[in-house]
Regions:
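Short glycine/serine/threonine-biased micro-segments
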Residues: 46-47, 105, 165, 187
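N-terminal helical cap/lid subdomain that shapes the substrate entry/recognition surface
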Residues: 2-94, 100-102, 113-115, 123
Length: 223
């Protein structure tokens, strides 16, 4: 079936948001007179959300006293500084342009709350180009449930089989597959060292956004 839309996960797929997360975590350590930790320790936990990143930042059990206060502080800081260093991954700008030139649409389906996702999209000039932005605020069940992808296809009035969903986590692939879309896993994203995208069951696995452009060359999802 002809490919008519490409939907992206946000963090680790469409956007490199790690620099903002890392800056906040390192600043929180510095203010507590703690030395910086390897950025990779934080980056590896991004897919696990604020809870996982704070736990890694302070080597702290989430059940420990004071953890929730640290997590809330992290979220407050991120609300203020969520779009300072974030940017499109290398090659993604060209991919988005190719999608638009092929008269297809693209959008974002993320587990990031809209209070963070919308400002980032606006700051990067992507909000007006994107056909939609689906966040947990818009659904009852987030990924890996298929509801966000089902909603996206319904909003676009497209058969899920004509949609490609791109993500850097198993939950993205599960959500897309269960919604009936084609799926692509990206190895350049925020993947935990213990995880392997080759085992997720995606229709295609890529190392760079440029590899997805091959799918657009003939506008047929042959993945």
């Amino acid at each position: 079936m002809r490919l008519r839309a490409v939907l992206f996960d946000m963090d680790g797929t469409l956007l490199d948001t790690a620099p903002d997360f890392i800056a906040i975590c390192q600043a929180m350590r510095a203010e507590r007179d703690l030395p910086p930790i390897a950025d990779k320790l934080i980056r590896d936990e991004i897919s696990g959300g604020a809870r996982a990143m704070v736990a890694a930042t302070f080597s702290m059990n989430p059940e420990a006293p004071g953890f929730e206060a640290q997590r809330l502080e992290f979220l407050e800081r991120y609300q203020r500084d969520c779009a300072v260093h974030s940017k499109l991954f290398d090659g993604m700008a060209e991919l988005l342009t190719d999608i638009e030139k092929a008269h297809m649409v693209w959008g974002v389906v993320t587990n990031k709350p809209v209070r963070f996702a919308q400002p980032i999209m606006e700051k990067l000039g992507l909000a007006e180009r994107s056909a939609l932005l689906i966040c947990p605020d818009h659904v009852t069940h987030s990924k890996p449930d298929p509801e966000p992808l089902i909603l996206a296809c319904k909003m676009l009035d497209l058969d899920p089989a004509s949609v490609l969903f791109v993500g850097d986590d198993l939950r993205d692939i599960e959500s897309g597959r269960d919604a009936g879309t084609k799926t692509a896993a990206v190895r350049y994203g925020y993947i935990h060292p213990d995880d392997n995208p080759n085992h997720w069951g995606a229709d295609v696995v890529v190392d760079h956004p440029a590899e997805l452009r091959k799918v657009l060359d003939n506008a047929v999802c042959s993945c």
